Amino acid sequence: MGLKAAQKTLFPLRSIDDVVRLFAAELGREEPDLVLLSLVLGFVEHFLAVNRVIPTNVPELTFQPSPAPDPPGGLTYFPVADLSIIAALYARFTAQIRGAVDLSLYPREGGVSSRELVKKVSDVIWNSLSRSYFKDRAHIQSLFSFITGTKLDSSGVAFAVVGACQALGLRDVHLALSEDHAWVVFGPNGEQTAEVTWHGKGNEDRRGQTVNAGVAERSWLYLKGSYMRCDRKMEVAFMVCAINPSIDLHTDSLELLQLQQKLLWLLYDLGHLERYPMALGNLADLEELEPTPGRPDPLTLYHKGIASAKTYYRDEHIYPYMYLAGYHCRNRNVREALQAWADTATVIQDYNYCREDEEIYKEFFEVANDVIPNLLKEAASLLEAGEERPGEQTQGTQSQGSALQDPECFAHLLRFYDGICKWEEGSPTPVLHVGWATFLVQSLGRFEGQVRQKVRIVSREAEAAEAEEPWGEEAREGRRRGPRRESKPEEPPPPKKPALDKGPGAGQGAVPGPPRKPPGTVPGTARGAEGGSAAPVPAPAASPPPEGPVLTFQSEKMKGMKELLVATKINSSAIKLQLTAQSQVQMKKQKVSTPSDYTLSFLKRQRKGL
């Protein structure tokens, strides 16, 4: 069973618009042909990014010239996807899968697939791969790479399994995606899960197993169960997002960028990106590079991605906020960038940092110890230059420099670190080490003492206890001294991190004083009648409203440092000691880590940029 007649009529594909028409036709069907679309994208990507030299020894392969916008009068060449080439690749893949899987050996009760059948398909893909190749190399995510080079990256293997299942008629097997991993769901209503690929350094022994253990340990890799369960149209969106336009470390293929942008807009118009936050962020990045007339601006798309994560995934995705922060950072919007990073940390605080969460650790490490310090350093330079030459700065540079005089910016910085510290609590792997502390002190020092002192840090737990437990003055005095940091080994651990009322910016965010502050949260205001006394008591004079933002810390480390953070002079030694100390929860769960537990070897690897 090969290509259908309606599919054949769309060939040859001579341009970007021809490829878009093919995708539009497939998306109009109930079951888009994943194998066909992946082969086409892989073919185009190979000859536009991997091998841009026009071959002369392949008689069937031709290139279509068209005018290039840059330089004016130049030509660009698009690889012509001829029917004979694509049909041969298609037939080879389907024959390989159908020849290796005997469906009669795997009865499908109720028309749904069994775990053994899914594992068998996974074995076929896995055993067809080359035994030795660099699995993180670029351009090996498509079925074109699988057929022509027997190479696939991690997510490419998962997609190939889904494509193979579709070729076998297993319509209940779909792709499941977190922000750094892929597996499959199958069975009635997609209730069953199965690992089909590796992650990180390789976990071959997990194939066929469920992801329940990863969900239960609250690791970011499995998003606590708030992962994407794709339908066929979202699987098409996944392969479009996986297009890699890079020719080398410094150059991208303009044609591939245009193709990806047009295909994402096609999916957007059909409503297939509504549940795909990272695709919306990807599209926003492309629009920032080359805006499409009449389309929403990048900022709108970034916020749509955040709204999608809130609506469909319990606001437990990290990258929608990372996309937004990266946009503001590139545009030197210091206040907005710090707020978005703080929101990112607010999401991560409800996870446990596990061994396989290294990718998001690297993202946070880079933000905290490279991006934010450099952004604040640049703002400090602009502020200093503005004081020396006040009439020579533009409005944008003045705004960037003034961020260091804004207590709300400082509150966002504290909220960012509070989320990181909370993330570490209860985690089996430590997060913070002296490298973090050094740059925290540096970033704190960018804000003057009078700016830092305008941030009011309150303790929600202390206020609630004081309101509900009318103990004596001695007990209240003990609470004012703050919780002791020592803990005994036999003490029961505190409850798990709450999942309620945790939305970014809500409950713990930096909010400017009275207008946005809910009533009853500032100590000293009337709490209402608490005894049974009927005699009216004269209300005390209203306390003056707080001058700056009000912040509630969630982590024990930041609670212990709150006086240090807003002191007139920064005590760098005390802050470093407090930040790198093991939290109470960790002391009960594991022995104190040695310095060798903290490895910086990943800094030598290439990282994704913001």
Curated annotation (Swiss-Prot):
Q: Which residues carry this modification: Phosphoserine?
A: 487, 543
User: Which InterPro entries would you find in this protein's record?
Assistant: Menin
| A GO MF term | Y-form DNA binding
Locate the region Disordered.
385-404, 460-552
Q: What's an example GO BP annotation here? A: negative regulation of cell population proliferation
Cell compartment(s), UniProt? Nucleus
Record's keyword terms, sorted: Chromatin regulator, DNA-binding, Nucleus, Phosphoprotein, Repressor, Transcription, Transcription regulation
Basic and acidic residues bias (residue ranges): 484-500
GO CC annotation terms, alphabetical: chromatin; histone methyltransferase complex
Per UniProt, the ranges with Pro residues bias are 512-521, 537-548
Q: Give the main localization category.
A: nucleus
Renumbered to this chain, the Low complexity biased-composition regions fall at 393-402
**UniProt keyword Transferase, yes or no:** no
- Report if keyword Transferase is assigned: no
Residues with PTM Phosphothreonine: 594
Annotated region Interaction with FANCD2: the residues are 214-390
Known role: Essential component of a MLL/SET1 histone methyltransferase (HMT) complex, a complex that specifically methylates 'Lys-4' of histone H3 (H3K4). Functions as a transcriptional regulator. Binds to the TERT promoter and represses telomerase expression. Plays a role in TGFB1-mediated inhibition of cell-proliferation, possibly regulating SMAD3 transcriptional activity. Represses JUND-mediated transcriptional activation on AP1 sites, as well as that mediated by NFKB subunit RELA. Positively regulates HOXC8 and HOXC6 gene expression.
Provide the assembly information. Component of the MLL-HCF complex, at least composed of KMT2A/MLL1, MEN1, ASH2L, RBBP5, DPY30, WDR5, HCFC1 and HCFC2. Component of the menin-associated histone methyltransferase complex, at least composed of KMT2B/MLL4, MEN1, ASH2L, RBBP5, DPY30 and WDR5. Interacts with POLR2B. Interacts with POLR2A phosphorylated at 'Ser-5', but not with the unphosphorylated, nor 'Ser-2' phosphorylated POLR2A forms. Interacts with FANCD2 and DBF4. Interacts with SMAD3, but not with SMAD2, nor SMAD4. Directly interacts with NFKB1, NFKB2 and RELA.
Q: What is this protein called?
A: Menin
